[in-house]
Regions:
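Short helix-to-turn junction characteristic of helix-turn-helix DNA-binding domains
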Residues: 21-25, 92-99, 138
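Basic, Lys/Arg-enriched C-terminal extension of HTH/homeodomain DNA-binding domains
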Residues: 53-79, 124-154
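Recognition helix of helix-turn-helix DNA-binding domains
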Residues: 26-55, 100-133
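Pre-recognition alpha-helix immediately N-terminal to the DNA-recognition helix
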Residues: 15-16, 89-90
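Regulatory hinge/linker segments at domain boundaries
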Residues: 2-12, 71-87
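N-terminal flexible/basic segments that precede or flank functional cores
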Residues: 1-2, 59
Length: 154
C-alpha cells in the first residue's frame, strides 16, 4: 500500500529547473536552456527545495518531487541486467537523501575511499551523469520508490 503525502505544487520555472537537473544537466546548462541567469535558476531551485519539505540537497529534493509527483515521473527502465554490488546497493537511499561521502562513510562505517569507489561505480552502472541524475535512474529502475521516500519524511 502506498503512503500518501500532501500534494506539492511547484511553480513552472521551479519544476523546469528540477526536471532539467533530473536529466543530468548542470544548473548552468539548465539556466541557459531556460534563457535565465544561473543565479535566477539557483533561486528557483532554492524555492523548490523549500517547498519539497525543506530538502537541503538537490538529490533529496528530486526524490521527494518524484514521490509526491510534483514533477513529471521518468519512464521506467527494465532492471534486468543491472548488476550492482551490495556496497553499491547500500548507497542508494543515502545518495537519494543527499548525504555526502563523509556522511555515508560514517553511516555505513566504511572507509571513505571504499564509499567513493562504490559511488563512482554505481553512477557508471546506472549510466548517470551525476548524483542528481542517479536519483532519476534509481527511480526508473524502481530501486527508489515513493514509499521509501515518504518513510524518510515521517
Amino acid at each position: 500500500m502506498t503512503a500518501t503525502v500532501m500534494k506539492i505544487n511547484l511553480a513552472r520555472r521551479e519544476r523546469q529547473v528540477l526536471e532539467g537537473l533530473a536529466d543530468g544537466r548542470t544548473l548552468a546548462r539548465v539556466a541557459s536552456d531556460l534563457t535565465v541567469k544561473t543565479g535566477t535558476a539557483t533561486g528557483y531551485l532554492r524555492h523548490a527545495r523549500t517547498k519539497l519539505y525543506g530538502a537541503s540537497e538537490t538529490e533529496a529534493a528530486l526524490a521527494i518531487a518524484y514521490a509526491t509527483e510534483a514533477i513529471t515521473l521518468p519512464e521506467p527502465l527494465d532492471p534486468e541486467g543491472l548488476d550492482l554490488s551490495a556496497g553499491q546497493r547500500d548507497l542508494v537511499p543515502l545518495i537519494a537523501r543527499g548525504m555526502s561521502v563523509t556522511e555515508i562513510g560514517t553511516e555505513l562505517k566504511r572507509p571513505l575511499d571504499v564509499i567513493r569507489s562504490d559511488s563512482q561505480q554505481l553512477l557508471r552502472n546506472l549510466d548517470a551523469k551525476n548524483r542528481v541524475h542517479a536519483v532519476t535512474r534509481l527511480w526508473q529502475y524502481r530501486m527508489l520508490t515513493a514509499d521509501q521516500v515518504i518513510a524518510w519524511l515521517r
